[in-house]
């Protein structure tokens, strides 16, 4: 996956995770809260992966 796709997918997962956590909070559903937190973390990791790809590409392009 390219860096832009990683960032977009990561942001989508992060937002979906936040929504699940909020729904879990509203319904007092611990399982939904946990799933939301996991999806939010996955999204953050995907975004970081995209940023890392950009940094590596930038470093390679400078050489």
From Swiss-Prot:
Residues 51-63 have a biased composition (Basic and acidic residues). Residues 34-49 have a biased composition (Low complexity). It comes from the Bacteria. InterPro entries: CsbD, YjbJ_sf. Residues 1-63 are annotated as: Disordered. Keywords: Plasmid. Belongs to the UPF0337 (CsbD) family. This is UPF0337 protein RA1131. It comes from Rhizobium meliloti (strain 1021) (Ensifer meliloti).
